[in-house]
Amino acid sequence: MEIKLINIGFGNIVSANRIIAIVSPESAPIKRIITEARDRGMLIDATYGRRTRAVIITDSDHVILSAVQPETVAHRLVSKEAPAQAEESAD
């Protein structure tokens, strides 16, 4: 399995293979997830003091805050996967 990395803003990089969800931080359930992750010590704040625009949830139960829009992170994730899929179909 190939390791794919994705930039989540300000030079912060996350393993794309570990991402389960990329969501907006506006809803009450997501705010609750952020609070619970902070209490458990599983919160990673990659916003550099800026407003949180995306919440990334990983398969290891880490919650990552990013200052980049969820759509932007998702677009970067999809554009990383597209070349790999093209290589696989060529084989």
Swiss-Prot record:
Cross-referenced NCBIfam families? MtxBflmRegRemA, PRK04323.1
Protein name, as recorded? Putative regulatory protein PTH_1796
Q: Which family does it belong to?
A: Belongs to the RemA family.
Sorted alphabetically, which PANTHER family does this protein's record hold?
REGULATORY PROTEIN SSL2874-RELATED, REGULATORY PROTEIN TM_1690-RELATED
Q: Which InterPro entries match?
A: RemA-like
Pfam families to which the protein is assigned, alphabetical: RemA-like
The coiled-coil regions, if any, are: none
Q: Taxonomy-wise, where does this protein's organism fall, top ranks first?
A: Bacteria, Bacillati, Bacillota, Clostridia, Eubacteriales
- Organism whose genome encodes this protein: Pelotomaculum thermopropionicum (strain DSM 13744 / JCM 10971 / SI)
